[in-house]
Amino acid sequence: MIKKIVLFALVLIGLQACKSEAKKEAPSLMKEVMDVHDAVMPKMGTIGKLVKLLNQQKDSLLEAAPTAEIDLKIVALSTGVDSLQKAHKKMMTWMKDFGGNFTADEILKGKALNAEKKSILEQEAIKVKEMEAAIIGSIQYAEQLSNQ
């Protein structure tokens, strides 16, 4: 009888440990997602400045006598602007979608997520990494263009 009680107690402790681990997992992933967002959000200003700079450079080249080299630079600058604008849009779209999927308590206070929302959060974690890569990549490309 004592063995059964001890076994039952161990099973309960094990289940409780699994339960608390699951509770920690979602807030941890939520924090990771928000950390990526918080890291790239300040770069939105950089994107705006680079769009303006590349457009200014492109406009000055459009006033010059056309050559093959100038045409290539104009195309590259246009590509850079397009890349920056797409990255910016990706961030805005991600924020809108993310905010529509989760409540403020879930995002800011770590409120427990149901299975469906955990699945959505896993998808959002992938999307936020893609968005981060698009932002960083477009900024790096634009900075290279602006220094030529």
Regions found by a protein language model. Give the residues of each.
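Immediate post-signal-peptide N-terminus of mature secreted/exported proteins
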Residues: 19-65
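Alpha-helical rod/repeat scaffolding segments in eukaryotic adaptors/tethers
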Residues: 23-33, 63, 67-77, 111-121
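C-terminal amphipathic alpha-helix
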Residues: 36, 40-44, 51, 110-148
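C-terminal motif of bacterial Sec signal peptides marking the signal peptidase cleavage site
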Residues: 14-17
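Subset-of-secretome marker
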Residues: 27-28, 83, 93, 134-137, ...
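Positively charged n-region of N-terminal signal peptides that target proteins for export
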Residues: 1-4
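Secondary-structure edge/capping motif, primarily at the C-terminal ends of alpha-helices
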Residues: 51-69, 98, 102-109, 142, ...
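Long, amphipathic, charge-rich alpha-helical segments that form helical bundles/coiled-coils
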Residues: 73-124
